[in-house]
Amino acid sequence: MIPLLKNPHFELIRHDVSIPFQAEVDEIYNLACPASPVYYQIDPIQTIKTSVLGAVNMLGLAKRVNAKILQASTSEVYGDPMIHPQPESYWGNVNPIGPRSCYDEGKRCAETLFMDYHRQNKVRVKIIRIFNTYGPNMSTNDGRVVSNFIIQALQNKDITIYGDGNQTRSFQYVDDLIEGMIRMMNTS
């Protein structure tokens, strides 16, 4: 982030996306919402408001200024999938009322809003489903598998695997994610 702050063409604006926002922009990357259960379960109502109201507000901005907009969704929209790996056409096996639903269903609803804004208002939307991202400066206490494994290994502890050990995960390095988001935004 520090190199960006030195760029004269970059401006960092802190704003709650659940509140409408006015700006003149060409592209919007809607990345708002904590992705770790440790953080999003602290205030589940605010979590779902961030996803749903944030999508409505950012889509409204994109419509007003004719900007392209990218929604950062999640692999969690698949729930506990019955198919591995999941094709994009797979709708998932979800629990709409569980303790993680504030995040999962908020992202599903945001995807729906994005497609509806595209169909109804011709807003140029992009949706990506992010899986387990790792890299420098990641939080060590967010309760996700990569950080848990690293901390346990550094502390010379046994690596904890929940379940029967047959689970599968897709991982992506943060630099690859950023490059992928930029490439996706630049597609027609």
Label for each model-derived stretch:
Residues 1-133, 153, 163, 174-186:
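N-terminal Rossmann-like NAD(P)+-binding domain of SDR-like oxidoreductases, especially those catalyzing
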